[in-house]
Structure formats: C-alpha cells, structure tokens
C-alpha cells in the first residue's frame, strides 16, 4: 500500500484545466448504437463495428462510398430531385444512422427528403422512402418490420405518401396530445408486426386560440395556439388504427371523450389488441383498458387505480419477451415509482421492486436469465445506477 501511494501522481492544474500543456481530452463517443450484439461506432467519414469483448474495430463503410452509391441511382422510389436527374442529398455523417435489423446487414439512413435502407456489407442501395418530399413532413415514424413510413404534414397524418386524414384546422392527427403530459411524447404507434398504425386524433376546435409572439423572424409575428385554460373547455382526443394494406381506419369505441385522457398506448405482442391507460380530468382515477385492434371495441378493463390526491401514469405496459401473458406495469401507488408484474387477465402476480427510491427507467431484458434491467436511485437520489431484477 505504501509503494502504491508513492507511485500515485497528484494532478496539476496543467493536467486538469482545458488549455493546459498536459491536459488530455477524453474521447467523445456520440451516438453509439447496437446492431444485434455488435456495437456500432458512427463518425463523420467512417462507420465502424466494435467487438464488445475485444474492443477491436472493423470498418463497415465510408461516407464517400455511400454517397457514390446513392448518387449513382435513380429508382422508382427516389425523390423528385433524383428522378429529374439531380443528385440526392448527401450523407453528411453517420451519427443519426440506425440499425433496426439485427439479422440483416442493413442500416437506415435519414436524409432531408428521403429515408434510405442501405446494405453496408455489399455497399448497395436496398430501398428508398420519400418522407414527404416538398411537403416537409414532421413526426416521422418508420417501422422496419413492415417497411412503412408515417409522418405528419401540418395537422394531418400520412403513411407511405398517402393521406390517412384530411381534417380542417382545429383537428390534429398523428401528433402528441394532452399537452405532452402523462408520458405522452408522440402521436403514432406501429404494431410489432408493422402492419397497423395507432394514432391520436385531437379535436381542439372548441378551445379558444391563445396568441404567442414569435420573435424568430426579423419582424415578430403572432402565432396562435389552442391552449385550454383552467376551468374552460379542453380538447377531445380519440385513437384510430390505420391499416396500410386496406387503407382503412378504425377508431376505438371509447365513448364520449370529454374530460378524459387516453395515455400510454402500447400493443399486444401479437398485434391483435391495443392497450391504453385512461385517466379522468381530476387525475385521481386511472384504468388500464384493452381494445380489439380490428373492431375498436373494448375487450376488457384489466385494472383500476385511484388515489385521493392524484395518479400519474407515465409509462406504457411492457410485455415480457419470454412470456406474452405477463407484463410490467409502473406505478407510484406506494409513493415511489416501482414495477408490478401482472398477467393479461389483470391479476397482480407480485411487486418486483420496492423501497424508498425510484425506478427511473426500464433499459431492457436478459431473456436467458429472466431479468429486467433498470436504472434507479436506490443508492442515492443524486445518482442513477443500473440494476438487474429477477422476474421469476
């Protein structure tokens, strides 16, 4: 111990302060991703695969090569610019590239006017998907399982460049609702098979427009939004399910949507039913409901949760990958956010975590060992540490 203490060198200001002669900048590794069990290290000019056991890096492709391949193609699904003989938008870097196919050497490249599926082993173009072209789509949601792409243009929803809705101003489809409360951050939800799309439809025509000042342009402009003031009428939300194959939409038969919140949408693993947590406007009564994805009819109310002050559902249910009859429900019923194991009949099997600390996030599963991986504040509310929880 004495020798080790003598060998330790105390850091100097030159070591610690940026600009010091001996200051060492720690390498930043942004946007690391997984392709199956292989770690992907994206860069500006190159894309590397990293062996997680050895750390060995293997070059997959380069930005120059990808751009050469893409700019040499004119395909039936290409953008208007490409069809007219102009070059596609160039890939500027690999940081927003995704790898949603663990069993295929494909990557998803997001360009301003098109999504590209690219084979990085063969350096070949696989598929191109315009994501709105000149219409400037937002809220883009791509399903690798079904190969469909959903997006919104202004207040309407499109799938594969076909209009799903044609609503007037005051009715918004495919976007986040309920002022982004209760864990809501998006408005479209693909089924696990990628053949059905659940989406929000929000009627806010009864809500009085509220003026906001946009100071972005040189001369400020008034931008009106519909904001439900306390004690006044709130917007009404419904949930639709669109089938790209038939191009038909079924809406859930939820009844009168007045003063009701429909939150935390999730799909059954087989895609035959849709789950959501309904909340009243007083926010003291929540219900977990299951709907038939073909008919939109209510199949069952699995459980209800009430509290004298409030309940605050923030997370959709999450099915166990090794047993589709069981799912994890998150609740603050004992004062802290914890995990509860339920079956699809609505029966509580057991509480998986407990204590005066929060489960912050479910990070994934270890299916072989029947474990769920979580981040929590168990050690300290100032820290976030990783834990594994045995489900069996």
What is the role of each PLM region?
Residues 5-392:
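Beta-propeller folds
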């Amino acid at each position: 111990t004495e020798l080790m203490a003598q060998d330790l060198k105390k850091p100097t200001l030159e070591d610690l302060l940026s600009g010091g002669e001996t200051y060492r900048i720690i390498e930043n590794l942004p946007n690391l991703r997984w392709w199956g069990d292989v770690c992907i290290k994206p860069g500006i000019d190159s894309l590397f695969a990293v062996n997680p056991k050895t750390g060995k890096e293997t070059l997959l492709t380069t930005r120059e090569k990808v751009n050469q391949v893409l700019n040499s193609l004119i395909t039936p699904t290409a953008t208007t610019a490409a069809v007219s003989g102009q070059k596609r938008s160039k890939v500027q870097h690999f940081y927003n590239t995704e790898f949603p196919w663990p069993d295929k050497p494909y990557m998803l490249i997001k360009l301003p006017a098109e999504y590209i599926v690219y084979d990085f082993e063969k350096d070949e173009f696989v598929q191109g998907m315009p994501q709105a072209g000149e219409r400037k789509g937002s809220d883009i949601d791509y399903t690798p399982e079904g190969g469909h792409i959903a997006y919104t243009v202004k207040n309407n929803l499109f799938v594969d460049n076909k209009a799903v809705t044609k609503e007037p101003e005051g009715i918004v489809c495919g976007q986040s609702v309920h002022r982004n409360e209760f864990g809501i951050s998006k408005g479209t939800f693909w089924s696990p098979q990628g053949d059905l799309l659940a989406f929000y439809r929000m009627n806010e025509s009864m809500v009085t427009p509220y003026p906001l000042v946009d100071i972005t342009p040189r001369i400020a402009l008034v931008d009106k939004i519909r904001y439900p003031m306390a004690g006044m009428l709130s917007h009404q939300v419904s949930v639709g399910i669109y089938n790209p194959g038939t191009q038909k939409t079924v809406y859930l038969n939820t009844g009168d949507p007045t003063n009701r919140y429909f939150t935390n949408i999730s799909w059954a693993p087989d895609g035959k039913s849709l789950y959501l947590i309904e909340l009243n406007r007083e926010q003291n009564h929540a219900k977990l409901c299951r709907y038939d994805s073909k008919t939109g009819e209510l199949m069952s109310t699995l459980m209800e949760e009430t509290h004298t002050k409030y309940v605050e559902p923030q997370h959709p249910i999450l099915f166990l990958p090794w047993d589709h009859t069981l799912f994890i429900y998150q609740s603050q019923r004992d004062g802290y956010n914890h995990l509860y194991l339920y079956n699809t009949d609505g029966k509580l099997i057991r509480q998986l975590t407990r204590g005066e600390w929060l489960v912050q996030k479910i990070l994934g599963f270890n299916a072989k060992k029947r474990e769920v991986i979580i981040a929590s504040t168990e050690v300290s509310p100032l820290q976030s540490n990783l834990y594994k929880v045995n489900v069996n």
